[in-house]
């Protein structure tokens, strides 16, 4: 089934798709002009220490970074690596994971780094935009260089932004596209106005100036200047991650306009810098932001407001992207289950309360700790270089199936070499605040490792039994009137996907722990497919009319509301005569033919008799501890309003520790 988002076909070029792309895909990269040249000039010692060749070289590096990484790697190559229309590092992983079990490592590292570095985006973009208020005379006269008012305004905007997430962004989201189209047009026009004052700045497109700057003594940072240059392309990974919202055609057709507007703005900033670099008043300024300084004074207020709106939209796109990334990681069993809410009519519109709270707290803490955009820029971008490098590794295995091996290795080596240089040039940021993003990435990676390895240990040692072997006992129990009727339908959620086999604990629960007499025994397993929007099922009744093994096939974008799906399956089976009707004498619904349901959820606790390696035992203990802190199976599977019973069973993994007691004889 073709999935449609926002009311348009993602596979085709449409104006609606173009507008959505501008509102969702380009937010991060579209706000980079707010701070990139500011960071480059500031870290070189200010306006008094930059020359013409330095300015031209900086813009040249920006242009070629956008060309090589954003345009060639992502727009031209990576967008082809879509998983049924979905993009991003986890979707790419699902395409190549059969190549090697070790590919889970770059996928986890890249996903954790992308989530962690994203925390800085709302903080740095909104703070930079609000700092533009200082260029307004009335504001400057009232507050001067007082950073506290900037921090307060920024925190207020961030609080409002995260508070409205629970209500969904479907309505306001429709306005994002047109607003960002106007924003990019504004970037291009303002840039062109200043660029037209010195057309010779076009020389910056010559790569000679980029290479010259890297070895020039005028460049105080040397290769480390690339850490600031990289800020111009941090949104490239988000561009690939948001592929599923709009489709590759809409991104590829809209990108040339976006890039032209961005380059015009950077050229305009360069022309403005060349014009004022000898101005003593400008040189005396403690901090200079070419973006706001080059805007005509008469429309500066408009420019600051517009920049703030663009920063909020960019932050919203990142927040939505974080929800999607976490959701995909959960479906791939890389993160524990979290409560996911769908406030809008679009499946892509989701809200994860836990993620929202963590992002808000982290963003607010960063604003309070770093205070100025200059300090935030010094910390920004490090983790994204790691994500890009991990994407390149996964992309290599994708390309090996599409083009000759030598071409795949050559292309991957080319991008990896560039990204390694960017990584080491950004490494200095670790000591200037980059440790925050790296620390968060390591924390998230540890959770992913614990969860993935814990699942691996459990699945490798889980004791499976043949369900068919117990059909006679289940039939006898069903017909044994001496045992009280437990429920008309008893449902067990199983974690295994082996046909005809289930976990031994389930049979133990039915026959041994408390005999559960029922008319129908249901064993339901959910398999997350590589296709994002699959909604299918299959059944195996083992030749009976009282045992139903249900296999749900749900895409990694689909919520696992088992109760809803089970209702449909019951009616389908009754309609075809495979399941007897269950007429109810007492019901609010006259003629109701479906009986009551009891969902039995088995909770596992690590048994002390399990002989596990010390490391594996710690992994399992950590996994179970994390599991207790996250969403319950009842909430995850949409069973909040169903009859649910929890049963605790010992989780015995590996060989059991043997015990031997000796009877003490009575001594008379």
UniProtKB/Swiss-Prot annotation:
One of its GO terms (molecular function) is potassium ion transmembrane transporter activity. It is a multi-pass membrane protein. Its main location: membrane. The chain crosses the membrane at residues 17-37, 59-79, 104-124, 148-168, 175-195, 221-241, 256-276, 299-319, 350-370, 380-400, 403-423, 430-450. It comes from the Bacteria. It catalyses: K(+)(in) + H(+)(in) = K(+)(out) + H(+)(out). It is found in: Cell membrane. GO terms for cellular component: plasma membrane. Keywords: Cell membrane, Ion transport, Membrane, Potassium, Potassium transport, Symport, Transmembrane, Transmembrane helix, Transport. The keyword Cell membrane applies. PANTHER family: K+ POTASSIUM TRANSPORTER, OSMOTIC STRESS POTASSIUM TRANSPORTER. Transport of potassium into the cell. Likely operates as a K(+):H(+) symporter. Belongs to the HAK/KUP transporter (TC 2.A.72) family. This is Probable potassium transport system protein Kup. The lineage of its organism: Bacteria, Bacillati, Bacillota, Bacilli, Lactobacillales.
């Amino acid at each position: 089934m073709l999935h449609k988002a926002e009311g348009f076909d993602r596979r085709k070029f449409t104006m609606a798709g173009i507008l959505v792309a501008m509102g969702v895909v380009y937010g991060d990269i579209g706000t980079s002009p707010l701070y990139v040249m500011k960071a480059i000039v500031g870290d070189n010692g200010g306006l008094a220490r930059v020359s013409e060749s330095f300015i031209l070289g900086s813009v040249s590096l920006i242009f070629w970074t956008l060309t090589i990484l954003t345009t060639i790697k992502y727009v031209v190559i990576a967008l082809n690596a879509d998983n049924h229309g979905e993009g991003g590092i986890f979707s790419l992983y699902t395409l190549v994971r059969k190549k090697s079990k070790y590919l889970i490592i770059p996928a986890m590292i890249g996903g954790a780094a992308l989530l962690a570095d994203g925390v800085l985006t709302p903080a740095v973009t909104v703070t930079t935009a609000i700092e533009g208020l200082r260029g307004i005379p009335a504001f400057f006269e009232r507050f001067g260089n007082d950073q506290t008012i900037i921090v307060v305004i920024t925190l207020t905007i961030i609080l409002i932004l995260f508070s409205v997430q629970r209500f969904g962004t479907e309505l306001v989201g429709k306005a994002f596209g047109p607003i960002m189209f106007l924003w990019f047009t504004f970037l291009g026009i303002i840039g062109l106005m200043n660029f037209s004052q010195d057309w010779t700045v076009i020389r910056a497109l010559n790569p000679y100036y980029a290479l010259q700057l890297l070895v020039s003594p005028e460049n105080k940072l040397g290769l480390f200047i690339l850490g600031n240059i990289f800020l111009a392309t941090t949104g490239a990974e988000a561009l690939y991650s948001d592929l599923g919202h709009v489709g590759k055609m809409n991104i590829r057709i809209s990108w040339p306009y976006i890039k032209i507007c961005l380059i015009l703005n950077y050229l305009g900033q360069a022309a403005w810098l060349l014009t004022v670099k000898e101005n003593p008043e400008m040189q005396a300024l403690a901090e200079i932001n070419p973006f706001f300084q080059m805007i005509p004074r008469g429309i500066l207020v408009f420019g600051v407001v517009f920049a703030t709106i663009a920063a909020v939209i960019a932050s919203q796109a990142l927040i939505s992207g974080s929800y999607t990334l976490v959701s995909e990681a959960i479906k791939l069993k890389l993160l524990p289950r979290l409560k996911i809410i769908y406030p809008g009519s679009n499946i892509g519109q989701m809200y994860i309360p836990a993620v929202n709270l963590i992002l808000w707290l982290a963003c607010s803490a960063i604003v309070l700790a770093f205070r100025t955009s200059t300090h935030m820029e010094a910390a920004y971008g490090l983790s994204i270089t790691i994500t890009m490098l991990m994407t390149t590794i996964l992309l290599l295995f994708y390309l090996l199936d599409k083009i000759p091996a030598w071409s795949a290795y050559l292309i991957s080596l080319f991008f990896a070499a560039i990204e390694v240089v960017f990584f080491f040039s950004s490494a200095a940021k670790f000591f200037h605040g980059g440790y925050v993003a790296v620390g968060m990435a390591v924390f998230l990676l540890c959770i992913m490792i614990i969860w993935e390895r814990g699942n691996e240990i459990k699945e490798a040692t889980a004791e499976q039994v043949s369900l068919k072997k117990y059909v006679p006992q289940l039939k006898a129990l069903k017909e044994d009137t001496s045992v009280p009727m437990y429920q008309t339908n008893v449902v067990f959620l199983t974690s295994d996907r082996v046909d005809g086999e289930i976990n031994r604990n389930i049979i133990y629960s039915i026959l041994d722990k408390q005999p559960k007499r029922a008319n129908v025994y249901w064993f339901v397993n959910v398999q997350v497919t590589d296709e994002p929007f699959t909604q299918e099922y299959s059944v195996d009744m083992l030749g009976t009319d009282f045992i139903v093994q249900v296999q749900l096939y749900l895409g990694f974008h689909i919520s696992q509301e088992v109760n809803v799906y089970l209702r449909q399956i019951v009616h389908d089976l009754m309609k075809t005569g495979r399941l007897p009707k269950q007429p109810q004498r007492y019901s609010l619904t006259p003629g109701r033919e479906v009986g009551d349901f009891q969902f039995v959820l088995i909770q596992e606790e690590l048994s002390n008799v399990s002989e596990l390696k010390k490391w594996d035992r710690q992994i399992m203990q950590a996994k179970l501890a994390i599991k207790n802190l996250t969403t319950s199976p009842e909430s995850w599977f949409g069973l909040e309003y169903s009859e649910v019973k929890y049963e605790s069973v010992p989780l015995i993994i590996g060989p059991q520790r043997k015990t031997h007691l000796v009877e003490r004889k009575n001594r008379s």
